[in-house]
């Protein structure tokens, strides 16, 4: 059976047993901040097991995509070198949430594995383990299923503590836990290894293929196990492992799925497919990289993005080792999509995006890979001992982009290890330098601790009545704020919107008789709204009733920009692809700023398309609608939730243009899209690896921007004696004339330099048989000096030359040494001395070097270094 057939058979079998087929969740866990990546089938059902979530079904089956590369579960260093380690794998699983328990779970597993209708595995090839004291499971296996006692193994607490066992699963020190039973396949006597529980169990003969976890207890802090009222079942069977069994091969890399990827990798690299470890690395890594990018991860220098970057660069290095010329890794995506795209459609729908991301990252790394490898080889050649020093590992990481595990990989191939502790010390030192160089701001919200909550009434009003329930000055609770004092006011109810979701907090004022408090910002801590500002008149005391008035004009302008970000978000997904995710935003009354995931600059044509889409929705003038509902209903309606945001039981769904944009949002918005009037993008750029930023304006600000641009066009036209109709033609003519004049100037400078060369050659002095020339030629740029040094080397024949110039307020230096002297005297060394003398830097080849500096007054002193330099070296 092919891997795809096994996957489908598993899902279909459990559907016939009353299970609901549930799609694989994203590799980015959305309900567990403790996880870097989804690494087990049960991750998406965690809240079901904990009783925090109720679903419409109590039996589920899935084929879950998983990644283990980074954090606690890190298989990266072993991938490619063993038969069963992978960065990406599929976990087949069936689950019961308080429905069936041990008897059914065991029967289901045995039936699927051994029935001639399903996998039809030989029963005599299967071994079973149970927790030592789990007599119930043991009896089901032996008395009901019929597994002989000689193929049953009881596993006790083999990890040094009560319930610390390979056959006892825990979610943590406390909480749900229970015994598990595992099914092993015997690959045969020709492979070394012993049954589970034996001294030889680490061999490859007996391989675990299916684990059934029985969650039947709740462990309390005192270590006591209490029976759960509704026991559950969590099972997992690796698709790659069971495929190897069904296809009668021992290594996962020999199954059909990997054979196709290995062939594609060999073709892309241009090498043979002979089972090399490096080829296995590439074939494995294309799966994890492809799926991670499809799920929204982009290469970066932190978090999930850095793990992805490490995997990509490891694959590139192994491809380079196999002789790859140019970019190759992205070429394997098509084979991955063909192999797994039916089961995981995101691979096909995002194939082009995955290819672009991989190619861009590969090309970026190629710029430093060869140089970094050369530096590493030089360091290894001088290595004494078998440990690569931590400072070398750090240099490769910091300068050439080599992740630590990539250097460890290379060291391993040479039977060396790396000094991880030394590397971490270097990293700590770098982090400390970064901390020392940064300026810290104080989070005023963290200083204010408020137990009460504020009732927000600002969705439909910009003013209202409230009562002062707390006052703060310098983070301390006070009874009153006097005139001129800055502080924070907390009301029992307020129309002021608190900064959230990228939208800035409202401004305005609070009035209580003759007392006025000017609100300069509004933030939130817990459920309390904090009105930051200053007392303009009188004294504000706790208990005072106030009239709260928001600056409605500012809020309205802000709301237009906020609504525009929603339209822009959807437009970005339409123009750039569904991989686009919001990474941050800032919305105020003047403009909007929107950060999003994307791997390359947005082109001018794409900018125009974005503006066209948003302005089309603006012109439709459709109502902006809100609805309060539960999170699951919102998701079913297609509402987009921002990754990493915390949502309560009820959420606010904001719809614009019908179903054009549907997002969860608690902000203040326009009433209709037409209120935005006009949308104009004013800038686009990168803010971090894999993150782009667009800034835009709307309404009156957009009109003002366009009017200013129109004035600039008029002024430019006047400067070149044209008008807006012939501006481009006129400007092109001016630029062409400028190019011609620059060319003529270069020719004149070359003639002048040649004439100067004739004059300068006679000024050379002789030092130990060589000619040494140092001269100052103000007004000449570096290009002219380089040409002159070449000319002088030909004329002088056996010489050391140093030329300097004051050019545009700075020093330009060029040094040259004829080739017959370059083994004794190096132009780069002379340049370092001369450039340092003028407060700058320089370097180059042994025969030619360039540099410069800012200290024009020291230029003559720098030129005077040429003669002593020659005297010392000759």
From Swiss-Prot:
The keyword Aminoacyl-tRNA synthetase applies. It is found in: Cytoplasm. Disulfide bonds: none annotated. Catalyzes the attachment of alanine to tRNA(Ala) in a two-step reaction: alanine is first activated by ATP to form Ala-AMP and then transferred to the acceptor end of tRNA(Ala). Also edits incorrectly charged Ser-tRNA(Ala) and Gly-tRNA(Ala) via its editing domain. GO terms for cellular component: cytosol. Its EC number is 6.1.1.7. This is Alanine--tRNA ligase. Binds 1 zinc ion per subunit. Signal peptide: none annotated. GO terms for biological process: alanyl-tRNA aminoacylation; negative regulation of DNA-templated transcription. Keywords: Aminoacyl-tRNA synthetase, ATP-binding, Cytoplasm, Ligase, Metal-binding, Nucleotide-binding, Protein biosynthesis, RNA-binding, tRNA-binding, Zinc. It is an enzyme of class 6 (ligase). The lineage of its organism: Bacteria, Pseudomonadati, Pseudomonadota, Gammaproteobacteria, Pseudomonadales.
């Amino acid at each position: 059976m092919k891997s795809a057939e096994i996957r489908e058979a598993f899902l279909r079998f459990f559907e016939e047993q009353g299970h609901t087929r549930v799609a694989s969740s994203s590799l980015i866990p959305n309900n567990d901040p403790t996880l870097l990546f989804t690494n087990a089938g049960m991750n998406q059902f965690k809240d079901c097991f904990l009783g925090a979530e109720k679903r419409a079904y109590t039996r589920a089956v899935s084929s879950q995509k998983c990644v283990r590369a980074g954090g606690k579960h890190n298989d990266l260093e072993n991938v490619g070198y063993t038969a069963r380690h992978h960065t990406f794998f599929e976990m087949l699983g069936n689950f019961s949430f308080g429905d069936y328990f041990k008897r059914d779970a065991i029967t289901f597993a045995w039936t699927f594995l051994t029935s001639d209708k399903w996998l039809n595995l030989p029963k005599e090839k299967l071994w079973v383990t149970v927790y030592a004291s789990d007599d119930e499971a043991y009896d089901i296996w032996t008395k009901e299923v019929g597994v002989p006692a000689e193929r049953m193994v009881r596993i006790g607490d083999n990890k040094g503590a009560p319930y610390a066992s390979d056959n006892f699963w825990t979610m943590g020190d406390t909480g749900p836990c229970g015994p598990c039973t595992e099914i092993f396949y015997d690959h045969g006597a020709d492979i070394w290894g012993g049954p589970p529980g034996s001294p030889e169990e680490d061999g490859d003969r007996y391989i675990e293929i299916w684990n059934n976890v029985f969650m039947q207890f709740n462990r309390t802090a005192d270590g006591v196990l209490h029976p759960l009222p509704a026991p559950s079942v969590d099972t997992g069977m690796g698709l790659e492992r069971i495929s190897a069994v069904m296809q009668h091969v021992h290594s996962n890399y020999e199954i059909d799925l990997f054979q196709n990827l290995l062939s594609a990798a060999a073709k892309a690299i241009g090498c043979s497919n002979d089972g090399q470890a490096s080829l296995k690395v590439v074939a494995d890594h294309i799966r994890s990289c492809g799926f991670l990018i499809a799920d929204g991860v982009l290469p970066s220098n932190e978090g999930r993005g850095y793990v992805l970057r490490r995997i990509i660069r490891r694959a590139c290095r192994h491809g380079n080792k196999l002789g790859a010329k140019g970019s190759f890794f992205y070429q394997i995506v098509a084979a991955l999509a063909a192999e797994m795209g039916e089961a995981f459609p995101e691979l096909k729908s995002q194939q082009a995006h995955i290819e672009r991301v991989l190619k861009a990252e590969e090309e970026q790394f190629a710029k430093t890979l060869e140089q970094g490898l050369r530096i590493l080889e030089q360091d290894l050649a001088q290595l004494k001992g078998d440990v690569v020093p931590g400072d070398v590992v750090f240099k490769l990481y910091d300068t050439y982009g080599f992740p630590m595990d990539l250097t460890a990989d290379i060291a391993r191939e040479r039977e060396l290890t790396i000094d991880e502790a030394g590397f971490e010390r270097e990293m700590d030192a770098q982090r400390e330098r970064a901390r020392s160089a940064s300026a810290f701001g104080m989070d005023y919200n963290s200083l204010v601790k408020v137990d009460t909550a504020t009732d927000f009434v600002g969705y439909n009003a910009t003013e209202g009545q409230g009562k002062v329930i707390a006052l703060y000055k310098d983070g301390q609770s006070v009874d009153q704020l006097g005139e001129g004092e800055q502080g924070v006011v907390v009301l029992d109810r307020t129309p002021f919107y608190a900064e959230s979701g990228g939208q800035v907090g409202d401004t305005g004022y609070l009035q209580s008789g003759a007392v006025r408090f000017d609100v300069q910002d509004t933030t939130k801590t817990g459920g309390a709204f904090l009105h930051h500002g200053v007392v303009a008149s009188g004294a504000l005391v706790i208990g005072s009733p106030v009239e709260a008035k928001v600056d409605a004009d500012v809020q309205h302008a802000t709301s237009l920009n906020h609504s525009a970000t929603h339209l822009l978000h959807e437009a970005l997904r339409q123009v750039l692809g569904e991989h686009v995710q919001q990474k941050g935003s800032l919305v105020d009354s003047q403009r909007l700023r929107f950060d999003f995931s994307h791997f390359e600059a947005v082109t001018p044509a794409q900018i125009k398309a974005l503006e066209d889409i948003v302005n089309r929705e603006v012109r439709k003038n459709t109502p902006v609608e809100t609805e309060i509902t539960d999170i699951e209903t919102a998701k079913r309606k297609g509402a987009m939730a921002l990754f990493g945001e915390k949502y309560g039981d009820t959420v606010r769904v904001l719809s614009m243009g019908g179903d054009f944009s549907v997002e969860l949002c608690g902000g203040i918005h326009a009433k209709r899209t037409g209120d935005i009037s006009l949308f104009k993008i004013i800038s686009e750029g990168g803010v971090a690896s894999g993150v782009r930023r667009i800034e835009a304006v709307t309404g009156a600000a957009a009109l003002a921007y366009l009017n200013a641009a129109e004035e600039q066009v008029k002024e430019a036209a006047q400067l070149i004696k044209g008008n807006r109709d012939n501006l481009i033609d006129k400007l092109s003519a001016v630029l062409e004339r400028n190019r011609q004049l620059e060319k003529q100037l270069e020719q004149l400078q070359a003639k002048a330099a040649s004439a100067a060369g004739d004059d300068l050659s006679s000024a050379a002095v002789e030092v130990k048989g060589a000619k040494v020339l140092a001269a100052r030629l103000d007004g000449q740029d570096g290009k002219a000096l380089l040409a002159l040094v070449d000319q002088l080397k030909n004329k002088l024949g056996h010489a050391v030359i140093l030329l300097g110039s004051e050019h545009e307020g700075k020093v330009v230096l060029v040094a040259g040494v004829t080739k017959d002297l370059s083994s004794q005297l190096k132009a780069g060394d002379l340049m370092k001395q001369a450039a340092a003398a003028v407060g700058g830097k320089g370097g180059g080849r042994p025969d030619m070097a360039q540099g410069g500096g800012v200290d024009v007054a020291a230029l003559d002193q720098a030129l005077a270094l040429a003669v002593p330099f020659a005297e010392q070296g000759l």
